[in-house]
């Protein structure tokens, strides 16, 4: 699971409904949860990391995207809709290194 790009239901800020969005699994926790990083199509955040087709070992996203290491969350694995790909170990380590840097 670690390093997989998955599609999950992501709630709107007012919790009125949700939209399916990609996320990167960083930690497959024992039990029902995993720690994920948000993936979006915009990289306006200073810590966003570009995710290109070349970063995938398998699968892909439909267009260039950005992993947001400052947007981490715990998510119930049973709610994952599908796996769309797996990123390279180098890309996963880049994300983890950025998280460590952010933590200071």
Regions found by a protein language model. Give the residues of each.
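Conserved functional hotspots at enzyme active or ligand-binding sites that engage polyanionic ligands
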Residues: 1-104
């Amino acid at each position: 699971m670690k390093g997989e790009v998955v599609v999950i239901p992501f709630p709107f800020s007012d919790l009125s409904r949700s939209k399916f969005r990609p996320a990167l699994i960083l930690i497959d926790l024992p039990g029902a949860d995993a720690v994920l990083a948000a993936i979006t199509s915009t990289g306006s955040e200073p810590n966003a990391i570009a995710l290109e087709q070349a970063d995938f070992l398998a699968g892909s996203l439909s267009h260039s995207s950005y992993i947001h290491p400052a947007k981490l969350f715990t998510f119930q694995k049973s709610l994952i809709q599908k796996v769309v790909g797996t990123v390279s170990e180098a890309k996963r380590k880049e994300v983890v290194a950025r998280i460590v840097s952010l933590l200071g």
